[in-house]
Amino acid sequence: MAIKVSENGRLFTLQTKDSSYQMFADDKNVLLHLYYGEKIGEENLSGLIFCTDMGFAGNPEEAGPNRKYSLDTLPQEIPGSGVGDFRDDMIEIRHADGSFAADFRFDSFEILDHSYAIPGMPALYDTEEEKGETLVITMTEKASDIVLKLIYGVFENENVITRAARLENHGETAIELEKMLSFSMDLMYENYEMIYFSGRHAMERTAERIPVQHAKVEIGSTRGTSSHHYNPAVILCEEGAGETHGSCIGACLVYSGNFVAAAQKDQKNQTRFQMGIHPTNFCFHLEKGEAFDTPQAILSYSGTGLTKLSQQYHEIIREHICRGAYKHAKRPILINNWEATYFDFNEEKILKIAEQAQKLGIEMLVLDDGWFGKREDDNSGLGDWFVNEKKMNGSMAQLAEKIHKMGMKFGLWFEPEMISEDSDLYRAHPDWAFAIPGRVPNHSRNQLVLDMTREDVREYLLERLTTIVHDAKIDYVKWDMNRSVCDVYSHVAAQNRNGELYHRYVLGVYDLLERFLAACPDLLLEGCSGGGGRYDAGMMYYSPQIWCSDNTDAINRLSIQYGSSFFYPISTVGSHVSVCPNHQTGRVTPFRTRGDVALAGSFGYEMDLNKISEEEKEMVKEQVAAMHEYYELTHEGLYYRLTGLKKQDFMAWEFVAKDQSRALLTIVKTDAEGNMLPVHTKVCGLAEDKLYRCSLDQEVRLGRTWNRAGLTLHQVLEEYESIRVEFTEVK
């Protein structure tokens, strides 16, 4: 058992292979957080808490004359609100009498021999290889009939602990839940830095690192999606922690909507670490008997730096979040027509692209935006999911059949959650769009957001999508979402439920995705939101790969894919080779470099292959062959970042097979100088006592030698040039 409970049922120690998490219900039934870190025994660590009268830190009535006992200074597992803890709370409740108070105390616990599900939301699931365990701690509110269940999952071999919570209203009167996070954790004695991932459209997930001080460090999204601007995954690490040293705690929210993640030192220099649904524009009305569930947060600890932490997240997401026919099945190398044609295409153009792609070994053609309704630009047509047979010279089934006869798979782009005002759907159902009565709604890309909380909207979309997919025998769908959500108002929701709409929107999207995939179980679904605007573990439950960014510039992609790698498996990274000058930056990079960067992802092309040179066509063949050769290595192997957050003139990364029989190292020169210095890089992950041959010069050395001495290139890489180096075990 990974969940250990003391004989008196008040001390809980969650054990994974390399980490421990401990909490304790004290004599006043306050649930205290004692420890999360390197694996320890099950001894009670409550002695680590130093209680003292801090002044202006009030005392609950159970403390009697003891002024040292204060909710304002104790390391808590569930900090309430309005009752004496003045730090950021985890939960806020407005009662029927208008008061704000939440004071939850320990009541009981239950242990389950399997992982837990969350109604209507994605969560880690059990496999034949590993099943989780679950601890449910029931807390009761001191002065009302409200029950809070803290839910902990443990995946012992993966070094993962999950947190979620469920609030149940057992009282006679309704309550308003105005904040409820997935977890809160008070860390007592370390100085931490936070690593988070910021950005913007076409430049997502830039890794940034700042110290956690008494001023709060907070990131989040109120855009209705996890967003391009911040990612719902952060790391708290000890000062100076690096790839191979230092303590690190990761937190990754399995959710695709508004979120917040925060850390702050308190007056005792304890760090309160929190994550969950953003409280802005959030208010859930709970009648008697109703409940609210938070999304799941995935926690993981590494005592040996960031690389191990990332590898733990890669494994848990790849094995226990990603699902479906393509969880492990080899994914086809694709060609997408978007940057080749944008909206200006017809059947003839698409078939020419497919014919050339097939000759070069590409396995699937994806038809992007513009095939439906009156969609000649991005100002009309969204919602009218009917094939424009005039533009396509027939039905989608006819085009798909022609592609399939070439021996290729066929994919299609959709943007189900959006609607154009210039569409037949909007003219028939204007109330299906989010819009506040009396206000002109905000437009973005000249489109509005469908009310995904409505069952009739989801039924329409499900019928349209499944009909097209089944009729044309579609193999792949790219599911896009090209704006943020605002003007949130539902014409069918009660007014006292409007504070629920942002969350219910996400639940509606999840519901549609679940039913769509159940109806099309063999489909490969690739997520997208203007690229990486919804690149999160919640969406990965439905789409095992996500278009990582609308920016296909190979040099910008180094930063984007670097930031993505801290939490998300390389197999989830949608990454393509595109034309130069690049359409987003105007930069010109070597064709080989573009391929090497895209190989660190699901791999494909965004161009008209009829317009490239014969030399470049040969490079496509070589890249396609390389993808097949290294597929298992890049999609299932261990990933190492060899260059870091500090400024360098090259970027390098490495894949190592799980059996350590081979490794692939890639270097890209990012800056050039006069009288250039040699490139020297680390090598990681090779078995210490095995011999490996390097493909550069056929040098054979022990793994421990490569791991410690590294690799020097004896050739000068020009700016933006790349090189792949393979290490093969000598048997």
What are these regions (language model features)?
Residues 326-463, 476:
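Aromatic-lined carbohydrate-binding/catalytic grooves of carbohydrate-active enzymes
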Residues 671-731:
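C-terminal beta-sandwich/jelly-roll accessory domains of carbohydrate-active enzymes
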Residues 393-395, 427-429, 433-590, 602, ...:
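Active-site neighborhood of glycoside hydrolase catalytic domains
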Residues 243, 644-687:
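Carbohydrate-binding surface patches
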Residues 18, 165, 289, 335, ...:
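Conserved, mostly hydrophobic/aromatic
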Residues 5, 10-21, 30-264, 280, ...:
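Polysaccharide-binding surfaces and accessory modules of carbohydrate-active proteins
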Residues 100-106, 284-303, 720-728:
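Short Pro-Gly-centered flexible turn/kink motifs
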